[in-house]
Amino acid sequence: MDIRAAEISAILKEQIKNFGQEAEVTEVGQVLAVGDGIARVYGLDNVQAGEMVEFESGVRGMALNLEQDNVGVVIFGSDREIKEGQTVKRTGSIVDVPVGKGLLGRVVDGLGNPIDGKGPIQSTERRRVDVKAPGIIPRKSVHEPMSTGLKAIDALIPVGRGQRELIIGDRQTGKTAIALDTILNQKSAHAGADENAKLYCVYVAIGQKRSTVAQFVKVLEDQGALEYSIVIAATASDAAPMQFIAPFAGCAMGEYFRDNGMHAVIVYDDLSKQAVAYRQMSLLLRRPPGREAYPGDVFYLHSRLLERAAKMGDAAGNGSLTALPVIETQANDVSAYIPTNVISITDGQIFLETDLFYQGVRPAVNVGLSVSRVGSSAQTKAMKKVAGKIKGELAQYREMAAFAQFGSDLDVSTQRLLNRGARLTELLKQPQFSPLKMEEQVAVIYAGVNGYLDKLPVGKVRAFEEQLLGTLRSKHQDWLNAVRDSKDLSDANANTLKGVVEATAKSFA
């Protein structure tokens, strides 16, 4: 057999030349100790703060404490599979989640993994969960209304696109119901073709029962609202790091719409539970505790999250992200640590009261304590015209009602004020799942403010409202369309409305 040395050496040279030199280098550490959802890892010298790491069992974690001789890692999931001495490898990426329209209609966990059994997420883009909020220059002041469909809020405590409005109250006062109605109210906008009118909804459930979240998703599905919503669920049975990261993940998903010239609203339900999860993580990482045992940077935790809600200017695409954080108080104590923090960060609060809730005033909004610091500039002209007086009248009514308990002989003007106040309070009640369009609210509030309900028994106010709306919807659709399109109540339209309201009032006389 003839061995051709030259040919063999040529082949060898060719193969050596084409030999891939890229050897994959992974930085690996070792678990020193693990317990309570925290792992101490040795050997990850170059790990970044907030970087995702992977354990042997496939469970992931996030490096939070970078100390001199070890790294404190919080574990996203169960720590049962992790043993001392196991290896941990860096992934090289900061925690990120999938974003985009492919997430609409889906339920995901705090890391963006689907948990609704509908297959993988159709998304190509990923974003870091914790990014810097937009600066001052790319922003624009809030000027468009974000309608909730609730008379008590849209008339008295208006919310604008890009605003952060806190929903605060004790347990079982209807905080989630307000958020749910706001989401359902966007259905008519999504039925139309106007992209600018559409408002995509992101709902983050933090530390809630799984049954509650499932119920919420079912309502969205039944009402046809899930198709324009994303639900992120970090339930009570999930690890604390998942409850901590879920709001940031939801925010990243909402920012996709904001940065692409679309509009979104995000509900954090609720941030008290996120603060508790963060406190648990911080204490286990041996960070020094502060007031109420929360770590010193719990204010920064919420401020950096809520500052990401913004109305962008023309150069940045005109998108917006509106935030509705929810805070649960204990026995109406608004002066506790977390509530005061979040009140000072947000642009106003909707304060819900247990007493009002049990009196049947639902939504149980305390109009005196609730404010919207920027929303009034976002109200439509039509709503401004009719709702201007209502807040003052209700404030006077509450003041008088307190005095009226003592005295029986009241003068005529006081009697008239109490009379009107009781009817306006009745008028602002609204059953769940029945949001009203802006133009319908204008008609109803017009009737209340202009005294057409004063002679009516309080029990008939609801029937009056339904009859008025029924008449407008069946016979005056052109009026509703005119007010909706112009967003103003012209003199001609006001006269038409006056006629309809007077006719309705006569039928009740």
UniProtKB/Swiss-Prot annotation:
It is an enzyme of class 7 (translocase). One of its GO terms (cellular component) is plasma membrane. The keyword Cytoplasm does not apply. It is found in: Cell inner membrane. Gene3D superfamilies: 2.40.30.20, ATP synthase alpha/beta chain, C-terminal domain (1.20.150.20), P-loop containing nucleotide triphosphate hydrolases (3.40.50.300). Signal peptide: none annotated. The keyword DNA-binding does not apply. It is a peripheral membrane protein. F-type ATPases have 2 components, CF(1) - the catalytic core - and CF(0) - the membrane proton channel. CF(1) has five subunits: alpha(3), beta(3), gamma(1), delta(1), epsilon(1). CF(0) has three main subunits: a(1), b(2) and c(9-12). The alpha and beta chains form an alternating ring which encloses part of the gamma chain. CF(1) is attached to CF(0) by a central stalk formed by the gamma and epsilon chains, while a peripheral stalk is formed by the delta and b chains. Produces ATP from ADP in the presence of a proton gradient across the membrane. The alpha chain is a regulatory subunit. This is ATP synthase subunit alpha.
